[in-house]
Amino acid sequence: MIYPVIDPAGTGSNLRSLIVSSGNSIADVGRMLGIADMSTMYKWLRGDALPGIDNMLSLSIILNVSINDILVTK
């Protein structure tokens, strides 16, 4: 069986869209997550890194979506 893999760039782009659609700014979401260095958020949005599971759960709550709605697979 072949399992899907997470597409970091697609997930980052999707995350950006979800943040904008929620009416929050990227900085607002970063503050809600307690992220001191905003470069972390931008790494996620560019697809250079993925949020850890704790931040992914928090993002799903902040954005009122499921984790599966944030992730893009290929």
Regions found by a protein language model. Name each.
Residues 19, 30-31, 60:
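The alpha-helix within a helix-turn-helix
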Residues 1-24:
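A short, Lys/Arg-rich alpha-helix, primarily the initiator
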Residues 16, 27, 57:
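Residues within the helices of the helix-turn-helix
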Residues 44-45, 74:
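DNA major-groove recognition helix of helix-turn-helix
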Residues 23-43:
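Short alpha-helical DNA-recognition segment
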Residues 47-58:
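Short, basic-rich loop-to-helix N-cap that marks the start of a DNA-contacting helix
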Residues 64-74:
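Short C-terminal boundary/hinge segments that cap the last helix of small helical domains
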